[in-house]
């Protein structure tokens, strides 16, 4: 009957509306639908294994996998630009990059330049020395020549603690390690995970048992870009809850 047909049509319409609402809810949970179908540009410095490094022509690592997972969660695509570490924040500030993921530590100074997401990993600054070094503690670093990657927290902390005259800056962590191996400097201060990689790959080096500083890694976005920041934070929360974040880290870092 016509009345029955109208009721059926109304029921089908209600089902469609419910399905649309469910899809909308899922999109909201997955981040911000405003970024669905868009390409987001990430700025990084691919000299920081296992967080970001070159594998042939590809840039891979923990940050890359996390960024891909975040973009997938938001329905967006990811494009990566590889720049010098101290160029990353200017890239984000100028809008050349939408966000930065580069094993970047949250510091008070950086918080005046960019907005940071929730923490997705923690790091420790470590000291690399040669196996025959007379440096056995942090106090022994006084008066020594310390190599750092320019613009990193290792650079910041070393300069603050030991003075400008004690710090030699390199564009790449690997260059600092090479200078240590050839006797041009006495120690290298860099994040623990890359430090472990450098020690494993270069004979005659070791890590001091005492960590230099502990810190938190987060994603940087342009100041005031709350829409993207909220979407990234929602995706980070989803990755933590699903266990995906731990899976990504475990893929690159085995338990010690």
What residue spans do the PLM features occupy?
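Ligand-binding clefts/hinges and TM-proximal coupling segments of bilobed small-molecule sensing domains
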Residues: 29-32, 77, 153-170, 203-211, ...
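Short, low-complexity disordered leader/linker segments with a strong preference
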Residues: 1-39, 256
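Extracytoplasmic small-molecule ligand-binding "clamshell" domains
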Residues: 29-103
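A ligand-binding cleft/hinge motif common to bilobed small-molecule-binding domains
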Residues: 87, 104-112, 157-160, 181-182, ...
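Alpha-to-beta junction loops
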Residues: 75-77, 93-102, 144-145, 172, ...
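Periplasmic-binding protein-like
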Residues: 46, 121-129, 196-237, 253-256
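Flexible hinge/capping segments at coil-to-helix
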Residues: 129-146
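Short helix-initiation/N-cap motifs at beta->coil->alpha
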Residues: 65, 79-92, 133, 150-153, ...
């Amino acid at each position: 009957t016509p009345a029955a047909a109208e009721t059926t049509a109304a029921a089908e319409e209600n089902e469609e509306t419910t399905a649309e609402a469910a899809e909308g809810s899922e999109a909201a949970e997955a981040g911000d639908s405003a970024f669905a179908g868009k390409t987001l540009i990430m700025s990084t410095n691919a000299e920081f294994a296992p967080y970001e490094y070159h594998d042939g022509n590809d840039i891979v690592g923990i940050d890359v996998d996390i960024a891909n997972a975040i973009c997938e969660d938001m329905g967006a695509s990811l494009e990566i630009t590889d720049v010098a570490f101290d160029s990353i924040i200017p890239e984000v500030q100028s809008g050349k990059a939408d966000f930065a993921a580069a094993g970047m530590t949250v510091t008070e100074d950086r918080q005046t330049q960019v907005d940071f997401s929730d923490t997705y990993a923690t790091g420790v600054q470590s000291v690399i020395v040669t196996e025959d070094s007379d440096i056995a503690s942090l106090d022994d670093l006084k008066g020594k020549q310390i190599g750092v990657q320019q613009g990193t927290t290792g650079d910041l902390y070393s300069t603050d603690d030991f003075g400008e005259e004690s710090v030699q800056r390199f564009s790449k962590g690997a260059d600092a390690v090479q200078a240590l191996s050839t006797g041009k400097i006495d120690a290298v201060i860099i994040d623990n995970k890359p430090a472990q990689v450098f020690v494993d790959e270069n004979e005659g080096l070791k890590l001091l048992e005492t960590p230099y500083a502990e810190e938190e890694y987060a994603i940087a976005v342009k100041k005031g870009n709350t829409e993207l920041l909220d979407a990234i934070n929602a995706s980070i929360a989803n990755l933590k809850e699903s266990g995906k974040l731990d899976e990504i880290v475990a893929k690159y870092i085995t338990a010690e």
